[in-house]
């Protein structure tokens, strides 16, 4: 009778645990990188919307010699009945995408402000272009004095209401 001693091959529990830990670390790194990419994509989409809307406002100004007035409500901004926003890129737990117009130092100016899904705030100014907005983001029309320090009166419009959602002109 012959007895064969065969050594069993396979992975030990320690080796399997090491592999599982390494996979977990790689997954965590991937998730963090993916979130960063998503945030940058949202920021870029919001900035693009601000530039495009500012272009529409400038076009209105070139034709009419003044900036369009805001409706002071959820209605569309004068002369811009529809404007499709990249809605998935915006924070929706607050009023968002503000257009403000008023007189500053005797000169008519406008500002557009928005908060990205990443939480970054951006503003486009008629005299300074696109910038990161560092002011406080408030509720309702209180954003306009921060975006555009005007003397009353000013008019405004906004695209998203925290309670009722996106206004029809933004779709």
Show which residues each predicted segment covers.
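Mobile, glycine-rich extracellular loop/lid and propeptide segments
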Residues: 58-62, 96-102, 111-113, 119-125
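Short, surface-exposed interaction loops/tails
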Residues: 108-171
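N-terminal leader/signal peptides at the extreme start of proteins
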Residues: 1-11
